[in-house]
Amino acid sequence: MNSGTVKWFSDAKGYGFIIPDGQDREVFVHFRSIEMPGRKTLQTNQRVEFEFEQSERGLHATRVVPLPM
């Protein structure tokens, strides 16, 4: 698993971006990839662990686990 910080996440749109630790690239995250009970959302600057894949549209998270704040 990789670690990173949420750059931003829109509840209305259901997606946002994560910045992996030590990198300047962004990883797209959709709410369906968030592993948590209840409402699946993330907060700006929240720490997460995640897995990601490369697609034709860029990097996207496939599994996101929010860390305690």
Sequence positions of predicted segments:
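Short nucleic-acid-contacting surface segments enriched for D/E, G, S/T with interspersed K/R
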Residues: 36-49
